[in-house]
A protein has these predicted regions:
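Extended active-site and interfacial segments that coordinate phosphate-rich ligands
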Residues: 10-11, 25-31, 169-172
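Aromatic/basic-lined ligand-recognition segments
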Residues: 8-9, 27, 69-94, 142-149
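Compact, glycine/acidic-enriched structural inserts
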Residues: 17-67, 183
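Generic recognition of stable, solvent-exposed alpha-helical segments in well-folded globular domains
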Residues: 44, 48, 59, 63, ...
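Extended, compositionally biased non-globular segments
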Residues: 99-156
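Internal mixed beta-strand/loop scaffold within catalytic domains of large alpha/beta enzymes
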Residues: 1-25
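A generic structural motif
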Residues: 15, 33-40, 90-105, 153-155
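TerminUS-proximal long segments
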Residues: 155, 159-190
């Protein structure tokens, strides 16, 4: 019953031919994909993200949650990959946010990750589950794989630029299922 989580935080620099930095930016995020929704887990994860954001700008949580919900959308299925979180990219220096401010923000979000996720793991790791629930988990993991291989910009970039394939695919779950035209029973937990 432990949900899947995704997290990364990054910094990019571009250089000219002389080795001078000509552009730089931060990006990253963290999001949660439960197979069975426990409202208190969702609230805890999102509140932890919001608390981290609010320390830097009270508008960041709403903005970056919306970006997360938009980015992690499985368009071919018309469904979200999970319950969201934060997603931000191209965070460049402005009058209001110097690169040091962005570094502090990204560090705050990154440092909040364990606080957001570990309590959920601790609560759910020993919850018993049935064979039917395991099947549902693997079907949902299949949707996670679909997103990564069809929509995820980082995965697609790696695949199209001769990246290290094993490293790129290592983030995919080891056991998944696809059931043709599967629809959960109306009113079920799924």
């Amino acid at each position: 019953m432990v949900p899947t989580v995704h997290a990364n935080w990054r910094y990019f620099e571009m250089y000219d031919d002389s080795g001078n930095v000509i552009n730089s930016w931060f990006g990253g995020g963290q999001d949660l994909t439960p197979y069975y929704l426990f409202e208190e887990d969702a609230m805890h994860f999102h509140q932890t993200c919001k608390t981290a954001c609010d320390k830097h700008n009270p508008e960041f949580y709403t903005k970056y949650k919306k970006q997360c919900d938009t980015y992690f959308w499985n368009a071919h299925r018309y469904e979200a990959r999970g319950i969201g979180g934060l997603f931000f990219h191209y965070c460049k220096e402005t009058e209001d946010m110097k690169m040091e401010n962005w570094f502090n923000f990204v560090s705050e979000v990154g440092n909040s990750f364990l606080e957001a996720y570990v309590p959920v793991v601790e609560k759910r790791k020993n919850v018993p589950y049935s064979a039917a629930q395991k099947t549902w988990q693997e079907i949902r993991r299949g949707r996670y794989v679909e997103f990564n291989l069809v929509h995820d910009k980082g995965t697609l970039f790696g695949l199209k630029t001769n990246g290290r394939i094993e490293s790129i695919l290592m983030s995919l779950p080891p056991h998944v299922q696809w059931v043709y035209d599967h629809h959960p029973e109306a009113g079920s937990e799924e």
